C-alpha cells in the first residue's frame, strides 16, 4: 500500500461501497438492525433523475478507503449555502492515513466553489472517537443546538395533517 489518497466524486458504480459504509457506521453503534436502506435506494436517490445527495469517495491504491455522503443546505441566519454531512466513514485499515480529513477538506473546497460557507453534521453521542476527530480538524460541537427529528409514525402523523386542506378565514 502506497498510502496515496485520491478523492473523487462518487458514481453510481460506488452505490454498493456507499451502502457498505453506512452499514459499517451502524455496526459501530450497534444499530445495524435499524438500517432499512438498500443499494437500490442509494442508486435511486443518489444517482437518479433528481439526486437527494452527493458523495465523495477516497481511494488508496484503487480501493475505496472511505466515503462522505452530503447534501446542500442553506443557513437563513448567514444567508448563504453550505452542506450537511450525512455520513463519513473510513475503512479501519485506512485509518490514520488522513482519509477522513482529506474527504472533508475536499468537501469544504467543493462547497466553497458553490458559494457555500459551512459544513454541518451530527455525531452519535456515544461515538467519542468521531467527536474527537471532528474537534481536531476544526468541526466543533455547536453547544447551543439540539437535533429534533420526526420518523415513522410521528412523520406520518405530520404528513397526514398536512394533507388536509388549508382553511383561510
Give, region by region, the residue ranges found by the protein language model.
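A short, internal acetyl-CoA/4′-phosphopantetheine-binding micro-motif in the GNAT/acyltransferase core
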Residues: 88-95
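A short helix-loop-beta-strand connector motif used in the catalytic cores of GNAT acetyltransferases and
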Residues: 46-57, 84
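Conserved beta-strand in the GNAT
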Residues: 57, 63-72
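Conserved acetyl-CoA-binding loop-helix of GNAT-fold acetyltransferases
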Residues: 96-109, 136
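Conserved GNAT-fold acetyl-CoA-binding loop/helix
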Residues: 19, 23-45
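Conserved GNAT acetyl-CoA-binding A-motif
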Residues: 112-122
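Conserved active-site alpha-helix within GNAT-family acetyltransferase domains
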Residues: 101, 125-144, 150
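A short beta-loop-alpha structural element at the N-terminal edge
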Residues: 6-20
Amino acid at each position: 500500500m502506497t498510502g496515496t489518497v485520491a478523492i473523487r466524486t462518487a458514481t453510481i458504480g460506488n452505490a454498493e461501497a456507499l451502502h457498505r459504509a453506512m452499514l459499517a457506521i451502524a455496526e459501530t453503534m450497534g444499530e445495524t438492525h435499524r438500517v432499512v436502506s438498500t443499494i437500490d435506494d442509494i442508486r435511486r436517490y443518489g444517482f437518479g433523475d433528481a439526486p437527494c445527495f452527493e458523495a465523495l469517495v477516497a481511494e488508496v491504491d484503487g480501493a475505496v478507503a472511505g466515503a462522505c455522503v452530503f447534501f446542500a443546505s442553506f443557513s437563513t441566519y448567514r444567508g448563504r449555502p453550505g452542506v450537511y454531512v450525512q455520513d463519513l466513514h473510513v475503512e479501519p485499515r485506512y485509518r490514520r492515513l488522513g482519509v477522513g480529513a482529506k474527504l472533508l477538506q475536499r468537501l469544504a473546497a467543493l462547497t466553497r466553489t458553490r458559494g457555500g460557507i459551512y459544513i454541518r453534521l451530527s455525531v452519535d453521542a456515544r461515538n467519542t472517537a468521531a467527536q474527537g476527530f471532528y474537534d481536531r480538524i476544526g468541526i466543533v460541537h455547536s453547544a447551543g443546538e439540539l437535533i429534533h427529528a420526526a420518523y415513522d409514525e410521528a412523520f406520518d402523523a405530520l404528513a397526514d395533517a398536512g394533507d388536509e386542506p388549508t382553511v383561510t378565514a
